[in-house]
Amino acid sequence: MIRARLRSNGWVFAELFLVFIVMWFLCDSLGCLKYTFYRPLGYNIDHVYQLSMIKGGESWDSSMTNADKYLGILQKLEREPAVEVAALSYWSLPMSGNNSYNSLAVQDTIGCELRIINATGGYTRVFRMKEDAKRPFAAMPVRGDVTSGNYVMLSEGAADYYKERVPGFSLDTPLSWYGDSANVVIQCGMIGSFRSYRYGADAEWAFRRIDENVIRTELRDDGAQIVFRVRENMDSPDYRSKFLKEIAPHLDTDNMFIADVVPY
């Protein structure tokens, strides 16, 4: 009788132990997801908006490229009193499916596949990314060829990748595009760690600043994205409706119109 009870209780304890193990793994997984979700992104999207632009109309200036129109909109937007800073970029927004990749190598052997960020100087300030005040992205040199320019600014995640594999790696270490050791790529600074997505690891990006010349000559017909940060004291729940009614009509350039503006 005692043996039967022990056998019965043993099954109960085994079931309780199994439930404990399942609950432990479930709570641990949920805890990790919660930690990852609420861990700082490394940039700030409060008071940040993105323009949605369309082309249309029965007539247009054939001498103007897409680049001319995007730049016209950007320049008008930057003059708006409520706008703190604005930026134009190509395939480069965080939390976006638009991607452009290339591989940078050290000593032409140790390479890392990096997302290439092509953006104007205001990009890091729009998203309030961490950067060295003495070596800001906005002051970085510009070189032509958006796919293989000679100046980059690595994200901290990318720099850490190289540091783990190359003893003594620093901002002074020369790089090269993988398979092209003849052309040296110079590091111009570093952007503090951040994540592309809420559940992502530290991003491995390489930033390249583009100016009007690069935009007009190399990106003239490509589609761009424009984002901007509104001054905190001038942002409000009805800012979008005010923007579309009062500001958007003044930004339209040739046959490129502002269709919408959305919080990032």
Identify the meaning behind each predicted range:
Residues 2, 40-43, 142-144, 217-218:
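Short secondary-structure boundary/capping segments
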Residues 69, 149-150, 156-160, 179-264:
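"Rare, low-scoring activations can occur
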Residues 1-3, 73:
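A short amphipathic helical element positioned immediately N-terminal to and/or at the very start
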Residues 27-111, 116:
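Membrane-proximal extracellular/periplasmic loop immediately following the first transmembrane helix
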Residues 75, 79-170, 183-199, 216:
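Short beta-strand boundary microenvironments
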Residues 6-35, 43:
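Short, strongly hydrophobic transmembrane alpha-helices
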